[in-house]
Amino acid sequence: TGRSTLQGPDSNNLKWSFHTENIVDSSAVLDHDGTIYIGSQDKRLYAIKPDGTLKWSYDIGSKIFSTPAISKNVIYVCAWNGRIFALDLDGKLKWKIQIKGRISSSPVISANGNLFLGSDNYYLYKISPAGKILWAFATRKYVDSSPAIDNEGTVYFGSNDSRIYALNPDGKLKWHSKTKGQITSSPAIGPDGTIYQGSNDGRLYALNPDGKQKWYFQTKKWIDSSPAVSKEGNVYVGSNDGSLYALNPDGILKWTFKTNGVITSSPAIDSDGNIYFGSWDKKLYALSPDGTFLWSFTTGGVIRSSPTIGPDRTIYFGSSDGNVYAIGEK
């Protein structure tokens, strides 16, 4: 949902930056002790201590576009070349498997520990915690979208075949809904079970859990950013037209905030309702719930990475300048 129970920083103070050797499009995930895990196009997964020093790195032999996932002290990371790795918290390999097709979709872990992820070979996969492929569901085009899973275990995701899919936990199709453009953005599920999905037709779609369309909202360009939903049910989404849109649960526009670049970074909402997101104008933005500008932080490159809110009012994100940034209180 992009919603956090933690507070974000109230200023743009740089705590530290950590340099990798290539673009960082991946977003950060944190474990219980605050270690930050993030991938880089330099082919390494990095484990960074909360003070910004390296804990370890692991060479996975191919660029990392997707965001890692953590469950039960295991880190799962997907490589562009179709390899999936499971590492322990010390960076030791537990297993790796190869699927056909490149992976830019980020793995999502269900309540019982199974992994769900898409591939450029048109499939969405369900993989056990031991690395066994349990099933693969065929779409008609690339699956770059990362799935979302509801409380019943239904799996929602989009495909470049312009469809939003809902699957049962056993991989059987519940329904699909057609959009007017390819889908690379990932869905979000609202507090009432509504599924929100952006598409390259420039629309944000709101669907009921049975697949019926509730409404859509039209932006001026395609949507690669995934929506975030506040606890009140307000929806925030970025568009390639450079604006962040805030909509109420009925799809009525509350406000827009214009940046000077494409927005593919997905917003993060903190416990106060403040919204954080990156733009191709090289800035990370912080806005209040009513769309008021709070602060921005400028990096040396386009920001496609989505911000992650950690403890101690710190935000972590990557930039195409090759750095991972920690913004927070001194």
Where are these regions (language model features)?
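Extracytoplasmic/lumenal domain signature
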Residues: 1-330
